[in-house]
């Protein structure tokens, strides 16, 4: 499968792409194993019910990973170099939540081949769980 991303000349302000995924128990277990983040807030219900969130939550970086899928696969897509990302975690993500990551082009810097993309993750209720901005270099 040969995939080609959008060049800066093929992008426009306001252009959007999304990726949606339901977060599973396996996602949390695998992320914990890969990242080493085995905080009991993610794995132990007894522990987690006494925390601020009153129950287990998924790792915030799982939602950030969905942003990476938007940028690397959908827009700009294959060939994109992910340069930077700001993130604000605004609400918890729980196992079973369906998260939609959206990237929206907000600024283009053609002379540097850079694109600033607003990044937002929402859950199935429309609650914004993660928000930030990415700077990428789209493929040539």
Residue ranges and their predicted role:
Residues 18-22, 88, 104, 135-137:
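Generic structural detector for well-ordered beta-strands
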Residues 50-58, 64-105:
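Hydrophobic beta-strand-centered segment that forms part of the acyl-chain substrate-binding groove
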Residues 33-36, 72-76, 124:
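Short, intrinsically disordered, mixed-charge
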Residues 18, 22-24, 63, 98, ...:
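Ser/Thr-centric signal marking residues that sit
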Residues 2-13, 93-140:
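HotDog/MaoC-like acyl-thioester-processing domains
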Residues 40, 76, 92, 138-139:
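Proline-rich low-complexity regions
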């Amino acid at each position: 499968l040969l995939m080609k991303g959008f060049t800066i000349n093929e992008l426009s302000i306001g252009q959007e792409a999304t990726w949606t995924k339901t977060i599973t128990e396996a996602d949390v277990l695998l992320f914990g194993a890969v990242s080493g983040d085995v905080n009991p807030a993610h794995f132990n219900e007894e522990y987690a019910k006494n925390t601020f969130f009153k129950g287990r939550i998924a790792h915030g970086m799982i939602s950030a990973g969905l942003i990476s899928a938007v940028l690397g696969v959908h827009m700009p897509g294959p060939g994109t170099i992910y340069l930077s990302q700001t993130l604000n975690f605004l609400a918890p993500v729980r196992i079973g939540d369906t998260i939609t990551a959206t990237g929206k082009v907000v600024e283009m810097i053609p002379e540097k081949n850079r694109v600033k993309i607003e990044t937002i993750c929402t859950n199935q209720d429309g609650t914004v769980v993660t928000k930030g901005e990415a700077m990428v270099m789209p493929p040539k």
